[in-house]
Amino acid sequence: MHKSKEDVAKLFADKLGTDPHLTPEQLTLVARDVLREKYVQAEVGITGANFIIADTGAVAVTENEGNGRLSAAWPKTHIVVTGIEKVIPSMTDLALFWPLLATYGTGQKITSYNTIIAGPRQENEKDGPDEMYVILLDNGRTNILANEKTRESLYCIRCGACLNACPVYKNIGGHTYSTTYSGPIGAVITPHLRQLGEWKHLSHASSLCGNCTEVCAVKINLHELLLENRYEAVTEGYAPFAEKVAWKIWKMAMLRRSWMNAANGNMKGKVVNGMGKAWTEHRSKLIFPQKSFNQQWKEKYGNR
């Protein structure tokens, strides 16, 4: 989405001295050779976890590339960094969650590499790390848990289905969100993981079409949670003064037909295209009809 295969080939040429015209398949082989040596030499490997299994204390990692397995097996020390919401009750629950994650994430029945890691290398074992550490992150997750209305967002299994379905994400990409979690789920949880006043704008980066809710693997009501974030931002006093004034004027106008009819096309154009210059910086100017729908209706049909 952000880089073409030509961009990647040029990057490899600049950093690794390879041919700038390599195909994607050839680039993959180059990356494999370079990275494999890095894994062999590494002292510490850091991975995440798709799930943490409560009854055994094991970590479950699912992937298609095999990088996670290499990070856990080759280095002497393996560090797992994962959120507290990744805990599932038992090993048997993987029979549901692994296929669910694969199907909604990539359309597969199951991903290529599925690994359960229960600790460092034991006596008489030939591979694995000497030490293993699991770091459980809160980082605002208990804030979400304490909020009854947004709590369901912690159900997320990070399949990415909502990102693939979101028209906003498909047009602007993930880097635009400037945060760890992008797309609809990122817009829902980031204001609570960080600071609502600073990140409330993410909840407005949505058409509220509901595609995200429709495709969610665990049935999180995402578009309603985006509205909840907007509501909380306003009730907690994070709405700008100019926005409050604008909505009050809008409300007064909507309750008075004479005001609405008085605002002809020229006036609307001057207000929107003149005062809202940021809107037209990257868009065409909005063109409004000279008469309102109400005026046109009366001219054509009278008062019926």
Language-model features: where?
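Small/polar loops that bind or transfer phosphate-bearing groups
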Residues: 82, 158, 217-218
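Short linear elements at protein peripheries
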Residues: 267-304
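The feature marks the mature, well-folded catalytic cores of soluble enzymes
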Residues: 1-149
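Exposed alpha-helical structural elements
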Residues: 7, 11, 26, 30, ...
